Amino acid sequence: MADADFLIVGGGIVGLATAYRLQSMQPGCRVRLLEKEAEVGQHQSGHNSGVLHCGLYYKPGSIKAVLAVRGIRQMVEFCEEAGIKHEVCGKLVVACNEEELGRLRNLEVRGRQNGLEGIEYLEREAMLEVEPNVGGIAALRVPQEGIVDYPAVCRELKRRIVENGGVVVTGATVTGLREQGGQWIARTPVDEYTGTFLVNCAGLHCDRVAEIAGEKRETRIVPFRGEYYKLKSGREGIVRNLIYPVPDAQFPFLGVHFTRLIHGGMEAGPNAAMAFAREGYLKTNISLRDMWDAMTYPGLWRFVAKHPRMTALELWQTFSKRRFCRALQKLVPSIKLSDIEPGGAGV
């Protein structure tokens, strides 16, 4: 008999939320979660800007749109119930020129279609009342957007999973997976674990976990590092809340933006440059295996061929603080080079 009904690989917020939800849907089910690090939420879940996204950008009716709108409501309810620090502060999406006004109006329509109530289109004068130092000519105010302490969410999910009878095993790197006798067997350096159902929530390593489980790896993870600057102490007040540019649908990134952090301070960024390791939070983090995996993947080269200018600009921005600052000045013209210093990074 298997040790667990559900064997989950990956202790980020997706794996933890999956485990907790399974326990809620099937009370009494046996859940075992395997996490390779010494604690949960150590990678993407702990290396992000802490934004609660509300689903503004997604195609109405799409799974992303439905889940984003539903998810932010559930996350806010969860945080309120658990006493986790969060704030629904809203955000501004700013049009910097006439060309972006049409896309801004389209976003307004899309947001309403996705069920986001209270969206406001602000002309420049009204926009400056909300954010006195912002540039641009118009903005959307989206009240649903917020900020949260995601590592605290991960810790609380882990606590509840264990309280409900689940098992969270840390320091358990999955090195092998096989299906045998109607159950899955996960091998780690120190033990083997069994489960009737296997759930892959391994984040940046999910393609490799799928491969060792016997799936053909047609898609690969190509790591991109998002680097942030932060506003220096005493200059955080230049920006009050969250400020985003109007996204360009041609590109897969939102562009640099300003994010107020839940524990204080203000971040600006990120850029998006290829990382040399899947856990490459520093420029000096290099994994030859990860680099080989990325460089031999045709999908990467198709992406570069499709977006050569953007690829070059993002790489330039990675190594040039001045270039990064110029990108920020499109949203807040009064930002100076001396106002920013290196912050965190995510992959």
What are these regions (language model features)?
Residues 23-46:
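Glycine-rich FAD pyrophosphate-binding loop
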Residues 140-197, 201, 205-208:
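Helical element adjacent to the flavin cofactor pocket in flavoenzyme catalytic cores
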Residues 14, 39, 205:
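Conserved Rossmann-like nucleotide-cofactor binding loop
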Residues 1-14, 32:
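Beta1/beta-strand and adjacent pyrophosphate-binding region of the FAD-binding site
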Residues 50-126, 136, 256, 277, ...:
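Dinucleotide-binding Rossmann-like beta1-alpha1 core, especially the glycine-rich loop
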Residues 17, 177-287:
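Flavin-dependent oxidoreductases
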Residues 125-128, 220-224, 230, 234, ...:
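Flavin (FAD/FMN) cofactor-binding core of flavoprotein oxidoreductases
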Residues 59-70, 94-104, 140-160, 169, ...:
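Short beta-strand to alpha-helix junction loop
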